[in-house]
Amino acid sequence: MWVRVSRSFPCPVCGRPDWCSLSEDGEVVKCMRVPSDFSKVDASGSTYYIHRQGDSPVPIPGEFRRSDRGDERRAPVEVRAKVYEALFRRLRLRQDHRDDLRRRGLSEEEIGRRGYKSWPSFQERRRLCEDLAGTLGVDLTTIPGFFVNRFDSLSLGGGPSCYGIPCRDKEGRIIAVQLRNDDSGPEAGPKYIFLSSLRHGGPSPGYLTHIPLYDGDVAECRVTEGLLKADVATSLLGTPVLAMTNCSSFQGLRTLLPELKVRRLILAMDADHRTNRHVLLGMANTALQLRVVVEEVAIEVWDPALGKGLDDVAKAEGARQLLEGREAWQWLRRLCLGFRGLIMPPDLNEMALSDGK
């Protein structure tokens, strides 16, 4: 049973008097603002986070999803980068995958620079695993995507026909891999998946933010959803575009943006935030969470007829509109009010009615 916070008893995690709840015994907090390892999406599409009070022995309720399992098994970033980069050096890019990347707007030079590779066949994977383990001297089961299969052999995850998209950190290292499957449709599974060993008892890739290769200043940068989308937009626009793994995965940006010394962040999320409540709420929560770590948060929008994503509108060389200050918050508030039954983040209402800073 959950009890709503109030002005007389605010949330012990974020300190606010609304939107959050506590368990009846006060030991577990359901905070709508401050991320934790355990999260869930409620019926309205809002993500909330579970926190234990102090050293409470009360277990986290079983229905909550662990946000970042596998931490204890995951190798340090420098080891993961060593393995993934060695793996990618051993792979090639098939012509059909090269054609797909060209169709998206990337030049041959950019395709080579960014390092996309076709995923190996199941027969090749065993040989690659043996080669990497013998050459690098690394326990590959600590690397997301590698696992011991039912035949007691090292194996590498991924579908039968896909290509790998490097997820890079601020040093340009490959710290994770996203796979784009060739097949689509309900029977084929998701189009994009991250390489993970979680279902085999190994590590997941964890919270991720992709930083596309870019040589210029990043004091002003954009953020969107999707690695390949960010790569294409960075290449075509000539400006840095960071990538969240989904519309609500802002956790990594909270620490990354200050490290990069980003002053102005422009949210350039998919055009369907106008019609998809989950995308809209993710966008609103991202803006609210990140406004405290940068000087300014702005929003970039465009005519949906030009394309869904920032990469589409960049390829089309279409017009984009920048919403700044109070105008940006009012845009989000107005869209939230248009969804029946959607619970708007209280902080958003405050920002839209203030000067927007």
Q: Can you say where each PLM-predicted feature lies in the sequence?
A:
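Short flexible/disordered coil segments
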Residues: 49-54, 181-182, 332-340
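Residue-level marker of positions within ordered structural domains that often coincide
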Residues: 16, 36, 106-107, 170, ...
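TOPRIM fold recognition
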Residues: 7-12, 20, 30, 218-222, ...
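Short, charged/polar, Gly/Pro-enriched secondary-structure boundary elements
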Residues: 37-41, 174, 319-321
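Phosphate-handling DNA/RNA-contact segment within nucleic-acid enzymes
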Residues: 67-71, 126-263
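N-terminal, helix-rich and Lys/Arg-enriched segments in bacterial and organellar proteins
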Residues: 110-123, 127, 167, 300, ...
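Non-catalytic accessory segments of DNA primases and related replication-initiation nucleases
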Residues: 1-157, 162, 184-198, 250, ...
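Non-catalytic surface loops within mature trypsin-like serine protease
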Residues: 35, 169, 181, 271, ...
